[in-house]
Amino acid sequence: ITYTSDEVHDILRTGFEKSPMFQGRIQGLGPRYCPSIEDKITRFADKNRHQIFVEPEGWETCEIYVNGFSTSLPEEVQMEALRKVPGFENAKMFRPGYAIEYDFFQPTQLKHTLETKLVKGLYFAGQINGTTGYEEAGCQGLMAGINACLSSQNKEPFILNRSEAYIGVLIDDLITKGTDEPYRMFTSRAEYRILLRQDNADIRLTQKGYDLGLVKQDRLDRLNEKLSYIEKLIAFFNTTSAIPEEINPILESLNSSKISQKTKLTKIMSRPQISYGSIEKLISVQEFLKENGTDTEAIEQAFIQIKYSGYISREKDNAEKITRLENISIPEDFEYTKLASLSSEAK
């Protein structure tokens, strides 16, 4: 990590009048979370320095990506300013920074399959839908490709909803709300974040991928083995109790209240202070692991499902209620003008 300085900012300002952003030749809104260095200097004039992340481009190259220094200023201004950044005094430039402006179609014109409503068989994915980012483009390309293939075979479309995957959140946001700036996916955009965890991505999506022909049998077999072990673990924790003599020293060391009688492990695991590492010390747990083997991913999944079961169940119920409502389809040729209960503005 390094930083710009007042001297760097002064050099960059000399090129502002030649910048297409400042001249008005580029009028589109850029990604909100990736402002150019000239934009940062202007918008945050009170800051005398800005952070730069020095990112190697690869193992076998001397190229460095200067993250935080995106710019459309003239090449000579970029070079002069770069060499005033601490650590870059002898820098050589392979490719100068540049700005692009691209057109997009409002994604509200699309179906959930990413097929256009007006032209049958035409699918849009990526920047043309108003998104920015590699993953955002990649996931749309995947979904558009899947549905184009299914359509050509007269099969049912493949749609992920908001409680099944972040892909579902992204596509639903785009086609129902549209966008007036480059759209980027964030976990905060999803209302079912307890369900959309990185630790259960394989459980959520592997079977779907297999049904589509995108996942091989051996991968599905590994998932089924994991699910079987998770089921066995949860059954064990549900039926096994801890005795005060063994568990209380552990509870005391974690500032958790002691028990006075045998207590189910699931009840103890639901306490906020208790981690799997605490439970693993119990003789009954060690005997189970010795007999059934150790799968760290499955153990983590079982622990999460037990510890947060109340929250997970509640979120699943909420998601199912919304899904039931969303499954009530309104015909595309529905005549809203004939509804007396709708206001003139709504019609």
What are these regions (language model features)?
Residues 14, 137-160:
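Internal hydrophobic alpha-helix adjacent to the cofactor/substrate pocket in enzyme cavities
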Residues 53, 59, 65-129, 159-172, ...:
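A glycine-rich dinucleotide-binding beta-alpha-beta segment and adjacent secondary-structure elements
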Residues 141, 185, 308:
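Hydrophobic, well-ordered secondary-structure elements that form the walls
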Residues 19, 89, 145-153, 174:
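A generic secondary-structure signal for well-formed alpha-helical elements
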Residues 127-135, 191-193:
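Glycine-rich phosphate/pyrophosphate-binding beta-alpha loops
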Residues 189, 195, 206-211, 215-347:
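Extended, charge-enriched "interface" segments that sit outside catalytic cores
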Residues 90-93, 153-160, 216-220:
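Acidic/polar loop patches that form or flank catalytic/metal-binding clefts of enzymes
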Residues 1-80, 87, 167, 171, ...:
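An anion/pyrophosphate-binding glycine-rich loop and adjacent beta-alpha core
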